[in-house]
Swiss-Prot record:
Gene Ontology annotations for the cellular component aspect, listed alphabetically: extracellular region
Disulfide links within the chain: 2-19, 9-21, 15-27
UniProt keyword list: Disulfide bond, Knottin, Protease inhibitor, Secreted, Serine protease inhibitor
Ion transport is among the record's keywords: no
Pfam families, A to Z: Squash
UniProt GO molecular function: serine-type endopeptidase inhibitor activity
Family: Belongs to the protease inhibitor I7 (squash-type serine protease inhibitor) family.
Record bears the keyword Cell inner membrane: no
Superkingdom of origin: Eukaryota
Site feature Reactive bond, where: 4-5
Cellular location(s): Secreted
Protein name: Trypsin inhibitor 2
Domain observations: The presence of a 'disulfide through disulfide knot' structurally defines this protein as a knottin.
Amino acid sequence: GCPRILMRCKQDSDCLAGCVCGPNGFCGSP
Protein backbone atom coordinates (compact mmCIF):
# COMPACT_ATOMS: atom_id res chain seq x y z
CA GLY A 1 0.00 0.00 0.00
CA CYS A 2 0.83 3.68 0.05
CA PRO A 3 2.42 5.16 3.21
CA ARG A 4 -0.02 7.61 4.80
CA ILE A 5 2.16 10.70 4.38
CA LEU A 6 0.89 13.87 2.72
CA MET A 7 3.25 14.46 -0.18
CA ARG A 8 2.67 16.98 -2.94
CA CYS A 9 3.19 15.65 -6.45
CA LYS A 10 2.93 16.50 -10.12
CA GLN A 11 3.33 12.92 -11.34
CA ASP A 12 3.37 9.39 -9.94
CA SER A 13 7.17 9.31 -9.84
CA ASP A 14 7.12 12.15 -7.26
CA CYS A 15 5.43 9.73 -4.85
CA LEU A 16 6.68 6.86 -2.71
CA ALA A 17 6.43 3.27 -3.93
CA GLY A 18 2.84 2.05 -4.01
CA CYS A 19 1.44 5.57 -4.38
CA VAL A 20 0.06 7.47 -7.33
CA CYS A 21 -0.38 11.21 -7.82
CA GLY A 22 -4.03 12.08 -7.31
CA PRO A 23 -6.05 14.86 -9.00
CA ASN A 24 -5.81 16.89 -5.77
CA GLY A 25 -2.04 17.20 -6.25
CA PHE A 26 -1.19 14.83 -3.42
CA CYS A 27 0.07 11.24 -3.37
CA GLY A 28 -2.36 8.50 -2.39
CA SER A 29 -3.30 4.87 -2.88
CA PRO A 30 -4.02 3.83 -6.49
